[in-house]
């Protein structure tokens, strides 16, 4: 009887030991892959924090990919927040636009960087009078938890075209960094139309064809009252921003290139934000089914953008496309001149 009990005990210990070793190997593989993918950047010199790299180890990235999510959902106690030195910071950079330029893709890709924490939702603080009236503390409380050495980034594409926004952001932080992601103006306008059209179709509502909206039927000229066209006149909106911020505080991201060659564009943004280069080609892989790049955080966690990305655009009369591109051309040239970035749009 004693022999049987000892044999049973040895068997149980063997099973438990195997499970423990397996769990340990899994943990080592996971943490090792995270460290290899995104080693923590030496951010103490960049943002003036007191921590050294030794004091700011892999745990920051682990929290960023896991526990920070719990804090974001409000599942953390005040003691946990205090224990991990977590704070809700005002953004040090904002993606201000442009709608249908790739703002969501840019935000998600920048979130690959271990020193970046993104606001998950569009907050619409500066463009919405009701939200703005709630005050800056309300806005800060909408931000995700982060370490003091990390930077928070939010995006609300309506900011770029809303008249009151530049002054409001200036009053919050006159030295903030501003990201503008743009696409070829005619393509962006058609994408804008496509999103609205899809919403109408879901509600079984009829909607005019793009050609009828973009071209004034009375004059046969481009209809600048149509919002999708007006939004694509980038230089008109940028000039309003330049009344408050110098051009050095803006960085233009090529949204068309971000689709086909994301890494070079992300590296330019890292440089603009004074971030050490941490996003690599390993973080980005092409999904042939979806037709665009997806994100690889580590060997376990991958992420593709929502299915609404990469919508099929409707066929548009080539003569209308030609007319629109001719209309946008002088505005594009001025945009290149102001920003110092030539995008070679047709």
Curated annotation (Swiss-Prot):
Substrate binds at residues 122-128, 155-158, 226-227. It is a single-pass type II membrane protein. GO terms for cellular component: Golgi membrane; membrane. Keywords: Disulfide bond, Glycoprotein, Golgi apparatus, Membrane, Signal-anchor, Transferase, Transmembrane, Transmembrane helix. It is found in: Golgi apparatus membrane. InterPro entries: NST/OST, P-loop_NTPase, Sulfotransferase_dom. Residues 33-346 are lumenal. It comes from the Eukaryota. GO terms for biological process: heparan sulfate proteoglycan biosynthetic process; negative regulation of coagulation; protein sulfation; regulation of viral entry into host cell. Disulfide bonds join 294-304. Glycans are attached at residue 287. It is an enzyme of class 2 (transferase). It catalyses: alpha-D-glucosaminyl-[heparan sulfate](n) + 3'-phosphoadenylyl sulfate = 3-sulfo-alpha-D-glucosaminyl-[heparan sulfate](n) + adenosine 3',5'-bisphosphate + H(+). Its EC number is 2.8.2.23. Residues 1-12 are cytoplasmic. One of its GO terms (molecular function) is 3'-phosphoadenosine 5'-phosphosulfate binding. PANTHER family: HEPARAN SULFATE GLUCOSAMINE 3-O-SULFOTRANSFERASE 5, HEPARAN SULFATE SULFOTRANSFERASE. Sulfotransferase that utilizes 3'-phospho-5'-adenylyl sulfate (PAPS) to catalyze the transfer of a sulfo group to position 3 of glucosamine residues in heparan. Catalyzes the rate limiting step in the biosynthesis of heparan sulfate (HSact). This modification is a crucial step in the biosynthesis of anticoagulant heparan sulfate as it completes the structure of the antithrombin pentasaccharide binding site. Also generates GlcUA-GlcNS or IdoUA-GlcNS and IdoUA2S-GlcNH2. This is Heparan sulfate glucosamine 3-O-sulfotransferase 5. It comes from Homo sapiens.
């Amino acid at each position: 009887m004693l022999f049987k009990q000892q044999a049973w005990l040895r068997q149980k210990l063997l099973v438990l030991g195997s499970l423990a070793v397996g769990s340990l190997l899994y943990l080592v593989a996971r943490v090792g892959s995270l460290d290899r993918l995104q080693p923590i950047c030496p951010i103490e010199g960049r943002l003036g924090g007191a921590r050294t790299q030794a004091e700011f180890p892999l745990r920051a990235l682990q929290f960023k990919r896991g526990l920070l999510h719990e804090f974001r959902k409000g599942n953390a106690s005040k003691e946990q927040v205090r224990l991990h030195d977590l704070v809700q910071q005002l953004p040090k950079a904002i993606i201000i636009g442009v709608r249908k330029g790739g703002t969501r893709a840019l935000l998600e890709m920048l979130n690959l960087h271990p020193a970046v924490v993104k606001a998950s939702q569009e907050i619409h603080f500066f463009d919405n009078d009701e939200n703005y009236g709630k005050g800056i503390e309300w806005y800060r409380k909408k931000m995700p938890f982060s370490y003091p050495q990390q930077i928070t980034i939010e995006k609300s594409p309506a900011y770029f075209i809303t008249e009151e926004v530049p002054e409001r952001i200036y009053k919050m932080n006159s030295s903030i960094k501003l990201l503008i992601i743009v696409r070829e103006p005619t393509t962006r306008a058609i994408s804008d139309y496509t999103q609205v059209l899809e919403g109408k179709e879901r509600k079984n509502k009829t909607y005019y064809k793009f050609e009828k909206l973009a071209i004034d039927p009375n004059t046969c000229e481009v209809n600048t009252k149509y919002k999708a066209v007006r939004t694509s006149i980038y230089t008109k909106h940028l000039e309003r921003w330049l009344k408050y911020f110098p051009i050095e505080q803006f960085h233009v991201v090529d949204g068309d290139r971000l689709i086909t060659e994301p890494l070079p564009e992300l590296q330019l943004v890292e440089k603009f934000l004074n971030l050490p280069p941490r996003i690599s080609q390993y973080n980005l892989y092409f999904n042939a089914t979806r037709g665009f790049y997806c994100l690889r955080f580590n060997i376990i966690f991958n992420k593709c953008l929502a299915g609404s990305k990469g919508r099929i655009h409707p066929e548009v009369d080539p003569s209308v496309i030609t007319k629109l591109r001719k209309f946008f051309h002088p505005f594009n040239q001025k945009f290149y001149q102001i920003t110092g970035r030539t995008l070679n749009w047709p």
